[in-house]
Amino acid sequence: SCRSKADIDKYKWVADEKLYEDNDFVKEHHLSRHCIGLSGMKFTDAEIEVLAEKIRKMKADGTHLCCSIGFLTEHQAKVLKDAGLDRINHNLNSSRNYYPNICSTHTFDQRVANIRMLQGLGYEICSGGIIGMGESKEDVVDMLMELREIQPEALPINFLLPIPGTPLEHADMSVLSTAYCMKVLCLARLLVPKADIRCAAGREVYFKGEENMLLRVVDSIFAS
């Protein structure tokens, strides 16, 4: 984010050797899929072609591939689909009502439209949200009801980890008790029962010592 002053490593692309090494790890350990995350909201056609070539090489091993990649044009989405990309992650992040409080570069409706376009091209969809950004309980319910309409194949729930140098570095985390976090996951399970409910960021902090309890509600957890 242009608003972030966090101390992070910056680089264009992860080295091909690392990418293919991770893909080999996924295959050797019989993991369900390999998800590749890219920062940024939009990409050029030339950048998409570079990514498509990487996807072709990884897909040759039969890996189920997912990308978290921001907004795509229909042409770009078709290029990646033809290369073998199976799933795209595009989170709603919060409710329609609360979204302007966390993002000023685009609208909630633009995110929904991007997801609908991808579904129309035959992509599996991974879409969820982030809990702990100052939203109300009603906002959590509203976000999940929107996801109920979308019917993603996977629904990841992230619990905010405040990072120094970011706009939410001083966010009030007192609401995120283990019990509250579990209630959010249970609600996701009840409202979107066909989706794979996944616990993502924050599980090590908010479920510390209780992570086994997660598997009574969620289908999977994110690693690495």
Provide a role label for each language-model segment.
Residues 3, 7, 35-47, 98-99, ...:
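Glycine-rich, proline-tolerant flexible connector loops at the mouths of alpha/beta enzymes
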Residues 15-30:
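Alpha-helical scaffold segments that flank or form the walls of functional sites
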Residues 102-161:
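Aromatic-anchored, glycine/proline-accented short structural segments
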